[in-house]
Amino acid sequence: EDGKVLLGGEGVGNYILPGGDPVEFPELPAVDAKVTFTIKAEDIRRMVSKTIFAVSNDEMRPVLTGILIQVRSEEMRMVATDGHRLSKIIHRTIGYSGEPIDVIVPMKALNLVMRNLQDDDEPEIALAESRASFTTKSQRLVTRLIDGHYPRYESVIPEANPGRMNLRTSDLMSAVRRVSI
């Protein structure tokens, strides 16, 4: 009441914080989704963590400051590059069978989503031409997409690799530790 919010905790005490009238806050924009699907929190966390390191900080090339999300029949790909590093990860079985779509989601928006995901969440992701939304049981984040064409990364990834090596992970990790000292 009167623009204040009362917060209480178990045995901690009560706190009154200044707040605003909820009616004064703008409505979240509608996302006229071309693609809607759900994915487990652990899967989207894994995908973002495997690609976000390659996102560029160079504001002169805005398309590289986000992660390319490609939705295809039954799979979602995330791709990031800064011009020197490239990361691509594919998650199959997202339960989507519509038209393919490519969008570039800002890194800041994905960081917010990752920070607020609970382990048991299964966010619904809705992708449109200019916006994306990430909705869980308790929250909804809507972001503008980065406008532009992502570089054709497929040409730098070899189709076939004639060389192949099999080794135990423990042996590789041991060798890396010895070299890094």
Where does each model-flagged region fall?
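Structural preference for solvent-exposed beta-strand-turn elements
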Residues: 1-181
